[in-house]
């Protein structure tokens, strides 16, 4: 699978030292747009930036710049996707808009985000007929369990680690209910 990442999920998984889950599950590519790296993470994730940059340099995360999109002859498509998604999802969270737009443009088919507000991209992508499947960090952990990569105990332990490191106050039971 291929995935485009939103800002918060990057921060949550890196703070818990569980970023490797992304590379294991999305073995065909993990992608971020340059603005998520240069603006969003610079402002909200300075504590994990060195690790993210290391993974970009190691080729674990593919960073898409405007120039790279132009070289692939898809920059105008990306711009159109950004414009449409800003209207659909409110320009308040550009990280989400960029992550969705990148997924649409390059055919990533998976969006990993932790923004599950009503009317937001996660809920809309689940309810409407889109080619992109949204996942939260909890969804990724549950998928990893269902694929037999880890057992239930490890899944719960990892959920609690991310939940506590990022002070999310999420309930694992409610995340399982949403997943089902």
Q: Would you name each region that the model predicts?
A:
Residues 1-106, 118-180:
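Active-site-proximal, substrate-binding regions of enzyme catalytic domains
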Residues 109:
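Short acidic/polar active-site loop segments enriched in Thr and Asp
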């Amino acid at each position: 699978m291929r995935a485009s990442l939103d800002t918060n999920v990057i921060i949550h998984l890196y703070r818990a030292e569980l970023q490797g889950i992304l590379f294991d599950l999305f073995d065909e590519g993990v992608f971020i747009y340059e603005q998520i790296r240069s603006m969003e993470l610079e402002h909200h994730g300075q504590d994990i930036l060195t690790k993210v940059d290391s993974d970009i340099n190691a080729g674990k995360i593919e960073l898409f710049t405007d120039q790279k999109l132009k070289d692939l002859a898809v920059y105008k498509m990306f711009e159109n996707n950004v414009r449409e998604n800003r209207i659909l999802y409110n320009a308040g969270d550009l990280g989400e808009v960029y992550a969705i737009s990148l997924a649409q443009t390059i055919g990533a088919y998976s969006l990993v985000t932790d923004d599950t507000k009503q009317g937001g991209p996660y809920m809309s992508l689940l309810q409407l007929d889109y080619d992109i499947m949204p996942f939260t960090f909890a969804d990724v952990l549950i998928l990893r369990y269902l694929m037999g990569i880890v057992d239930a105990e490890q899944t719960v332990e990892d959920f609690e680690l991310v939940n506590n490191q990022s002070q999310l106050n999420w309930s694992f039971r409610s995340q399982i209910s949403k997943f089902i």
